[in-house]
Amino acid sequence: MARKKDSPQKAALRELMGNYLKENNVKVKDGTDVNSIMRDMMSIILEGALDQELDEELGYSKYDYRNKETDNSRNGHSQKTLHTSYGDMEIDIPRDRKGDFEPQVVKKYQNSITQDMEEKIISMYAKGMTTADIESHMRELYDIEISDSTVSRITDKILPIVKEWQERPLESVYAVVFMDAIHFHARNEGRIVKRAVYIAIRIEMEGRKDVLGMYVGQNESAKFWLSILNGLKNQGVEDILIACVDGLTGFPQAIEAVFPQTEIQQCIIHQIRNTTKFVSYKEIKPLMADLKRVYAAPTEEVALAELDSFDEKWSGKYPKIAKSWKDNWANLSTYFKYPEAVRRLIYTTNTIEGFNRQLRKVTKSKTVFPSDDSLLKMLYLAMIDITKKWTGHRQDWGQIHSQLEIFFEERLERL
């Protein structure tokens, strides 16, 4: 098959390179030699483009003083090391005397000519795009061919940042911490396994909401939560006023082992779902109406009376419902001791479930992750994107803060 005819630009470059190799007696033996030549070519092209940028900035070319219409001028060069796919190379960056010149070809704080592309790839990964989608996107928009391994290599740069974030120093006290787990599938030693991502969202005493931590483990267990809570304590957390959790067996005991004074609120919505999932369609509506009288009661005393009434009415058909509520009452009823504003904040884990739903949207194209690291990378990047919108605090936080200061006065004074 005949070689495709070169474009005029490529033909000129081919001739130039041929003359360069011949006149300098350059022998290309392996990839190392190719990289060396490419570095030289790239540095010449970049330096020429940078000089041209400064010409346009000043409005006159070098030595063309007759057309100079500015009090600014050239001021030599500074050297910069650029990391490229062909290895490190030194280039000369032109300077102006006033320091106004902001080069665009190689920006001031850019240390890699692929940095912008890497940022684009990381951003696409954060939006939940698969490696195949990213490859296609880069090919169509930028005419760049990249592989799965290249995407992984670029996004792997996030992992040290994630580790540093997981181990960062924390504040001594948090008003409320919501804790829950979300489940995914990942490959491990050639098998597809279920993974639990443990998530904690904090509300600071000033009312700001943020993600306290995310950790990948095996199926959700109180033992793993215990290790996370110990880690939080080692990072500086001395007290959590109220912890809002699901109904995982052993979870309250794990919290009490690390933060013995923490008030524990078990999620009412989780409890409703877990105890009514086997109720018949015909009876679910009246049963839920009776159950609402329990959790929506104005006081704990009224709630207990309504629970007894519910037990009498429904335990013939559904004996486990009232029993479960009574067995877990100590942690289900915590919110009754607080005023309405605090109750609304803590009686469900909707805060963290909303966050989990947003993570699901990002990861919906991934049925199985290649590894635990790839799962953590995507969730961390998605978290950064999601929490950008978390600004300010709740409108009623002033009222909530005042109430918490009264209820937890002694504990807060000790911190």
List where the protein language model places each region.
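Subset of Sec-pathway N-terminal targeting signals
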Residues: 1-29, 33-76, 81-86
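Acidic/histidine-rich catalytic cores and adjacent linkers
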Residues: 3, 260, 293-415
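Electropositive nucleic-acid engagement tracts
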Residues: 61-70, 129-176
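Basic, short loop/linker segments at the boundary and entry of helix-turn-helix/winged-helix-like folds
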Residues: 69-127, 143-156
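RNase H-like nuclease fold core
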Residues: 94-97, 105-109, 144, 157-245, ...
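Metal-dependent DNA phosphodiester-chemistry modules and their immediately adjacent helices/loops
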Residues: 102, 275-303, 309
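Conserved beta-strand -> loop -> alpha-helix junction used to position metal-binding or nucleic-acid-contacting
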Residues: 242-249, 254-290
